[in-house]
């Protein structure tokens, strides 16, 4: 029996065509966090096109051929949402679920970015800060990425000096306590926090203080972090809520 080679070739080519992979696109996204009004907030903007038109999403975009991922996300934050003053940026992870984008194959390199509480960038009209605990409906898997960035921050508050990236250069212990409380999601005792950070060598007094309040009393002392670059200070430490089992 002689097989019809043209039919076999057609079937083979048809199968190959049906199984040929899509071109994979690469995007960069940033979950930029800050502390304001005693809440941890994330920066979101509204999509201007389908899919997920008008849904809130993390800022970012496609990776250019001549950029590495961190250069790309810093550029896109500056150009698209006018966020230029980031005290800390680190890669959060790669999000590559095949169905994360409804119409194409898109792999995302996501970053955690931090903005200090005394910096208030002038945002475009389609961009706002949202409380991480009260996120609106978001596009794609961006809620998962935002929540992952919160967990990364919480973990690093335990064993690094990353708190420097959330506060002004000088601050009171009360401000620092509110920052850690909002970021960690539970109450933090100011005296314990001061003692832990001082023991690790990351916190020092400036010798200055704020003016006393209307009720009088001792003027609040000002402190600062000894280093404003990320440092691992206690690799095995885990901060826990009060009365939590160890």
Each PLM stretch: what is its role?
Residues 1-23, 34, 231-246:
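Actinobacteria-biased recognition of intrinsically disordered, low-complexity terminal regions
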Residues 17-56:
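N-terminal strand-loop-strand
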Residues 24-28, 41, 70-74, 78-122, ...:
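Active-site segment of metal-dependent pyrophosphate-handling enzymes
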Residues 58-66, 165-166:
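Short histidine-centered catalytic/ligand-binding loop motif
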Residues 110-112, 121-158, 168-174, 179, ...:
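NUDIX/MutT-family hydrolases
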Residues 178-187:
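Short helix-coil junctions and helix-kink-helix linkers
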Residues 205-246:
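Long, intrinsically disordered, low-complexity Ser/Thr/Pro-rich regulatory/activation regions
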